Amino acid sequence: MTLVTEVEAQAWLREVLHVDDASMSRLAHLVDLLLAENERQNLVARGTLPHVWVRHIVDSAQLLHVSRETSGSGEWLDLGTGAGFPGLVIAAIQSDRPVTLVDSRRLRTEWLQRAADALELSNVRVILSRVEDLESGAYAAISARAFAPLDKLLAISARFSTPDTLWLLPKGAGAQHELQMLPESWHHMFHVEQSLTDPAAGIIVGRLLAGKQPAPHVSRQQAPRKGKRT
């Protein structure tokens, strides 16, 4: 199934993901904030704005459906979050779940903090940092929306992961190719789910097993430095 219209997208959130009225209200407010801010800085491509519920809200929220985690309490880490997708959407739906949003661009992190404040999302932490400089830690889920090639992403981010950490990585049309570029011994740890918002796009889902860190073919990064918080 591929969602096409804004009506279909909102119906899917309510009927399939069972998003409650309070969360739907927060998502609608987020859309309004995004549309206003996009006039000041290019958060998302203008061509996607007429389909913002499909292209950004459901495209983010589907990670909860793909992971079968419609509820959860473990901290979620969203790397290279940009305009807050998927992390800000996750936080709006699961408002009791801690969500950390990381981006290296000050304008983006300032916007994220303003949006989180406007939505009264006390579960959101915004960090201004490159991923390589971010303080290590263990997270329940890690997302990154088209942030970096899979092998590089795993190399620089494995230190945020345990064998129980769920990775949810929207990758567009190149998802299967990126997975195949990993050594064959890694393939069983990840699989590709089809996106609900684009029939050509895939989401890489899986867990890193113990002893499989960092990712192959990429050198270990220098010791991390603690990132700045906004």
UniProtKB/Swiss-Prot annotation:
Catalysed conversion reaction: guanosine(527) in 16S rRNA + S-adenosyl-L-methionine = N(7)-methylguanosine(527) in 16S rRNA + S-adenosyl-L-homocysteine
Binding site for S-adenosyl-L-methionine: 80, 85, 131-132, 145
Subcellular location: Cytoplasm
InterPro entries: rRNA_ssu_MeTfrase_G, SAM-dependent_MTases_sf
Pfam families xref list: GidB
Record-stated family: Belongs to the methyltransferase superfamily. RNA methyltransferase RsmG family.
Entry protein name: Ribosomal RNA small subunit methyltransferase G
Gene of this entry: rsmG
